[in-house]
């Protein structure tokens, strides 16, 4: 199987990997782990979990839209939070989903 790799505009451009991988001839798209960083790789949100969540979801939107998809097309999304505690759940939910 052939794989197309993409670094979409609007996301940082890492040297070691690509942000999006598409299994050619299928509808399977794999997005690299998205964190609270802007297109230039600068951290966004500081210690504000809601702001970090918003940026990470914005990055997911950019990645999936780069191949013609939307959040409606995502089958699985895994979220990792450093130093998780149940008290952080409300802040995690404050991250607003970005629609264009």
Where are these regions (language model features)?
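Short, polar/acidic, helix-capping and beta-turn segments at strand->helix junctions
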Residues: 1-100
